[in-house]
Amino acid sequence: MEQYESSLAAAYIRGAAKRLSLSLPEDLLTKPLENLTDAELAVLLETGRDAELKLYHFKKKELLPRVKAVLGILKGIQPESLLDVGSERGVFLFPFLLEFPWVEVTSVDLLPHRVEMLQCISAGGIDRLTAIEQNICTWDREDGAFDTVTLLEVLEHIPNVQEAVNTAVRLARRYVVVSVPSQPDDNPEHIHLLTKNILTGLFQNAGCRKLHFSGVNGHLILLANVSE
């Protein structure tokens, strides 16, 4: 499984095997991921391919500059727990899981098939990951439920962006991390161009005053300290 992130791919295949009743030896389904041999990982990969599971999400690839930047921020603040909003294909979430193996992570997404993929990863051995089908704008989870909230390439898609920001600030105990495109593009799903001034207003309206902005390759990144 050299071209794959083996722990993530193996977890997904094992979780999907349970859902789909694929034939696998019991020990391959229950053995801790870190104890699987190369031969056992190869069996899992072959099973996943035979079942036509979508394994391309788990191929090793170079991190996007914006993802590297956010991971660097998170290494600086060392989150105790994380809520990732709109995880989609795991462009950020998967590297985070690999680089922060001690952090409890909750992912919320509107798309059922995205949530199901992440639930398979959790069921397959990465049980510190919880995936929920949920709308961040209307989620009534208790205040301060998560140390840090990430909204990465998400806010530009949300019609009521102020409501999403309000909820993120309410749910975070310490930080909210945001990335958005900094230039107009032709993506019809991008319904806002969120400039530094606009984001500042949104977070100030939510009661957050301590904001730090940075940028990388066409993206604006915000670290909002909600505890001060």
Predicted segments, located by residue:
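Conserved N-terminal segment of class I S-adenosyl-L-methionine
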Residues: 1-144, 148, 152, 162-165, ...
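Residues lining the SAM
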Residues: 152-155, 179
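Conserved helix-to-beta-strand junction in the class I
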Residues: 167-171
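Conserved beta-strand signature within the Rossmann-like core of class I S-adenosyl-L-methionine
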Residues: 173-182
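Short glycine-rich, flexible loops that bind phosphorylated cofactors or substrates
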Residues: 157-158, 184-185
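Helix-to-beta-strand junctions that scaffold the AdoMet/dcAdoMet cofactor pocket
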Residues: 158-159, 172-173
